[in-house]
Structure formats: structure tokens, C-alpha cells
């Protein structure tokens, strides 16, 4: 039987070490993701090391996942799992991905604030986009004390939100989110907008309230300054705004196509047929176009408007009630002809 000398054993051992190191390098450097585009993994506050492995594994390459699984299981990663939205690039190996997860090197995201009608709807959107629970968000937005800390009440809180897109972290806390929105609101209004509102003797909240009504009246941005001028004329008369969108909001029946006289008696501070002045707060998150339409309103002497009978989304304006009745009759006739109830 052939005997191996000590040098042979050293060669075998060295070869074994080289093989092991080669495997380590392969497993650590082989891309984790099997996709050829950036993938995102969302680590929640109830995740464990096993669930993290499962989440990454859903988009992972077998060899790359072997290395990542080894690193996660044989380290103290499970003792402090960092929440967040993590980008996994196509060429990133197990060691790089593990380091990002371990150190909490998450990737920010663009959050767009939608122009929704209710805070329930906003909470739902934010709950789907962020780590936050929608019920928790809604509770805060309907809590008087929480709103007052930000300088609002439950009627005006919609004015806090400027419908822009913001670079934000997926795992942001609710308090930090609201404070961020407050900073963005102040930045949006500071300067020219704030000065114009003051010259009009309106607060930013009041501008947002009127803008929200105008947004609901038309999607035609070019016409919004005209509508703003008409409503401002009514406020200065003073006359009730008589804005149909406020009736829909009061009834929470946003799908209504026609506002009949029987609906005008709804007992609500948002009923601008029964109450003079602006309603208590915005009836939706006002658009930037709507806000700027109020601040740059067209000066004219119109007091009435009615949707055009051609259903173009624009309006006929009138100076007198008699002229307005003629416009309203034409529009009502067009509705009847189309059997719109």
C-alpha cells in the first residue's frame, strides 16, 4: 500500500482549503437576484430571519441564496432585523445584500399624495404604499388632538397635504410622516402664495377649501381661475356659494349626477345652499392647479355659472339670476335628453 509523505498531505490540505475558499467566493459573489432588473424586498417589523430569507428567496438565485442564507443564519442578524425597503440589484452578491440588510441600508421611494375626497381614502392609499397601518393613519387624521398639534382640526386637516411626490422611506413613522407633510406644506406656501392669500384676506386653509370646491366643479384647469373669481364675488356680496359639490360631500354621495331641490335641505355645515361663507374645511385634498387658480383668480362680475349643455366640462357664466335660469334650463334639457338622473 502506497504511503503518502507529509508534503502530499499538505498539498491535499491546501487543495481542500482552496476548494472551500473557491466555493465561499462563488456563493458570496454569485448574484442573489435571478432578475435582470432591480428588485425590492420589504422587511416589516414582524419579520424573522426565516421570513426575510423567504422574501429574498422569492426573487433569489439558488447559488446566491445559499450564501445569503448562510450569512443570515450564522450571524446575529436575527437579533436586530432592520425594517425597510431594500433594493437588490442584478449584480449584487450575497455578501453585499447581507451587508445592506444588516446595516439597514434601505432605499427610499417616491410617495405621491393623491387628491382624494376623504381622509379614509387617504389612509387607505398611504397604508398600501407604506409600512404604516391604514387604520392607525385614519385614527390620527380623525383625532382632534392629533390634528391640533399640527395646527389643524379634523375639518381642515386635508389642507395639510400638498399633492406632490416626495422622496421618503417606506418604514417612516406616522409622526415623522405628518411632520414631513407639515414642512412640505410650509415650503409650498412660503413666499408668493402666502402673500397672495394674505392680500385676498384668506388663510391657506381657506384657499384650499375654495380650491377643493373648484376642483370638484371642473377638471378643466384653464377654467378654474374663472370659477374662482365667481365664487369670490359671491363671498364678497355676501351670497351663499351654492356649490353642488358641497352637497355631495355633505351626503357622502359623490356619484350623484344631478342635485335635486330635495337634497338642498341636508343639515350640514358643508351645505353651502343653507350656510353663507366657506364650509368648515376642504371637501378633498385640493390640487395645486386649484390652489393657484384661487390665488390667481380672474376678476369679473359674474355671480352664477352652470355646466354647458354640450357636456364639454366647461361652464356658462351669468351676471343675473334671470340669465342663469336660461343657462340652467338648457343644461337640464340636455340631461333629460340623455336620461341622466
What are these regions (language model features)?
Residues 12-13, 81, 148, 310:
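Generic detector of intrinsically disordered, low-complexity, polar/charged segments
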Residues 112, 124, 131-135, 146-341:
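Bacterial extracytoplasmic/cell-wall-associated proteins, especially those involved in peptidoglycan
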Residues 1-39:
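N-terminal type II signal-anchor transmembrane helix
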Residues 14, 41-44, 89, 199, ...:
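Pocket-edge positions in alpha/beta enzyme catalytic cores
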Residues 27, 31-189:
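Signal peptide-directed extracytoplasmic domains
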Amino acid at each position: 500500500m502506497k504511503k503518502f509523505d507529509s508534503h502530499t498531505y499538505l498539498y491535499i490540505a491546501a487543495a481542500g482549503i482552496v476548494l472551500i475558499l473557491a466555493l465561499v467566493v462563488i456563493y458570496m459573489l454569485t448574484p442573489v437576484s435571478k432578475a435582470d432588473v432591480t428588485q425590492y424586498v420589504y422587511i416589516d417589523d414582524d419579520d424573522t430571519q426565516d421570513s426575510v430569507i423567504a422574501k429574498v428567496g422569492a426573487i433569489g438565485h439558488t447559488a446566491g441564496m445559499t450564501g445569503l442564507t448562510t450569512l443570515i443564519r450564522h450571524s446575529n442578524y436575527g437579533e436586530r432585523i432592520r425594517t425597510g425597503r431594500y433594493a437588490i440589484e442584478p449584480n449584487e452578491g450575497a455578501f453585499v445584500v447581507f451587508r445592506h440588510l444588516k446595516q439597514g441600508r434601505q432605499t427610499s421611494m417616491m410617495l405621491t399624495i393623491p387628491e382624494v375626497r376623504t381622509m379614509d381614502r387617504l389612509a387607505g392609499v398611504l397604508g398600501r404604499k407604506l409600512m404604516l397601518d391604514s387604520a392607525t393613519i385614519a385614527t390620527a387624521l380623525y383625532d382632534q388632538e392629533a390634528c391640533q398639534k399640527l395646527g389643524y382640526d379634523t375639518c381642515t386637516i386635508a389642507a395639510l397635504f400638498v399633492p406632490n411626490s416626495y422622496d421618503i422611506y417606506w418604514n417612516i413613522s406616522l409622526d415623522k410622516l405628518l411632520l414631513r407633510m407639515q414642512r412640505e406644506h410650509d415650503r409650498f406656501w412660503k413666499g408668493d402664495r402666502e402673500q397672495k392669500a394674505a392680500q385676498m384676506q384668506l388663510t391657506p386653509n381657506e384657499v384650499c377649501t375654495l380650491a377643493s370646491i373648484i376642483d370638484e366643479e371642473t377638471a378643466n384647469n384653464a377654467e378654474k381661475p374663472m370659477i374662482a373669481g365667481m365664487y369670490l364675488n359671491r363671498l364678497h356680496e355676501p351670497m351663499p356659494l351654492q356649490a353642488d359639490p358641497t352637497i355631495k360631500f355633505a351626503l357622502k354621495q359623490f356619484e350623484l349626477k344631478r342635485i335635486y331641490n330635495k337634497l338642498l335641505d341636508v343639515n350640514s355645515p358643508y351645505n353651502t345652499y343653507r350656510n353663507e361663507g366657506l364650509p368648515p374645511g376642504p371637501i378633498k385634498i385640493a390640487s395645486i392647479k386649484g390652489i393657484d387658480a384661487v390665488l390667481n383668480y380672474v376678476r369679473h362680475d359674474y355671480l352664477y355659472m352652470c355646466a354647458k349643455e354640450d357636456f364639454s366640462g366647461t361652464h356658462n357664466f351669468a351676471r343675473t339670476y334671470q340669465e342663469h335660469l336660461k343657462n340652467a334650463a338648457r343644461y337640464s334639457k340636455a340631461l333629460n335628453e340623455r336620461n341622466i338622473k
